A protein has these predicted regions:
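Catalytic Zn2+-binding segment of zinc metalloproteases
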Residues: 108-124
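Active-site scaffold of zinc-dependent metalloenzymes
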Residues: 68-99, 111-114
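Bacterial N-terminal signal peptides that target proteins for export
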Residues: 1-8
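Bacterial Sec-dependent signal peptides at the C-terminal "C-region" and cleavage site
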Residues: 12-24
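Acidic/histidine-rich, surface-exposed loop or edge segments in extracytoplasmic proteins
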Residues: 25-33, 83-91, 128-136
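Metalloprotease/metallohydrolase-associated module, dominated by Zn2+-dependent proteases
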Residues: 33, 38-78, 98, 123-167
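Residue-level recognition of phosphate/Mg2+-coordinating polar/acidic sites
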Residues: 102
Length: 167
C-alpha cells in the first residue's frame, strides 16, 4: 500500500497539469471559434473578459443556438464538479456579426460575474448572486445586470471606433 501513494500523487498532479493547460473558453464550432477570435481582436473589452475567464475555475462552452429560448443570447450554469464550474453561453446565429460580438461581450460579463463568486455552484446560488447584483428580466428564470449592459455598450463603442474595421 505504501507504494500506491506516490502513484496516486503522480496521477493527481498529471490531471491537475492537464487541467491547467486546457482552455477554459471552448467554442463548440469553427464558426463560433471564428466569432470569439474576431471579437477578441476587435474589442479590448472582450479580450480582457476572455483572459479573466481563462484565469478562473470556470469552463465555458460557447455555442450558437437557434430556438425560441434564446432570442438573442443567454448564459447558464450547467453544473459544478469538484473545483470546476461548467457554464454555457448561447448566441443566436441569425443576428448580424457585429450584434453577435456585442452580445458575446455582454454574456462574457455574466460569466465573469459567476466566476468571481466561488459560492455560485448551482441554480439556487446563481439565482441568489444575480438577485444581489442585478434584477429579474424576461421572466423568473432570467436576470440582467448593469455591468453586462455597460460591457455591451462598451463593445459597441469599440466596434464603432475610428480606424476599426467593421465586422
Amino acid at each position: 500500500m505504501k507504494r500506491a501513494w506516490p502513484m496516486v500523487l503522480l496521477l493527481s498532479l498529471s490531471v491537475l497539469s492537464i487541467a491547467a493547460r486546457s482552455p477554459r473558453v471552448r467554442p463548440q464550432s469553427d464558426h463560433m471559434a471564428d466569432l470569439v477570435q474576431l471579437a477578441a481582436k476587435r474589442s479590448p473589452t472582450v479580450a480582457g473578459l476572455l483572459k479573466m475567464i481563462e484565469a478562473s475555475d470556470v469552463i465555458l462552452q460557447v455555442e450558437f443556438r437557434l430556438d425560441n429560448t434564446v432570442p438573442r443570447a443567454a448564459t447558464q450554469l450547467v453544473t459544478s464538479a469538484g473545483l470546476v464550474r461548467y457554464v454555457r453561453t448561447y448566441i443566436n446565429p441569425r443576428l448580424p456579426t457585429r450584434r453577435r460580438i456585442e452580445l458575446l461581450g455582454h454574456e462574457l460579463q455574466h460569466v465573469v460575474e459567476i466566476a468571481t463568486d466561488p459560492t455560485v455552484r448551482d441554480d439556487a446560488s446563481m439565482r441568489a448572486r444575480f438577485t444581489a447584483i442585478g434584477w429579474v428580466s424576461d421572466g423568473a428564470a432570467s436576470f440582467e445586470t448593469a455591468a453586462a449592459i455597460a460591457v455591451e455598450r462598451q463593445v459597441r463603442s469599440e466596434l464603432s471606433a475610428p480606424g476599426t474595421r467593421r465586422p
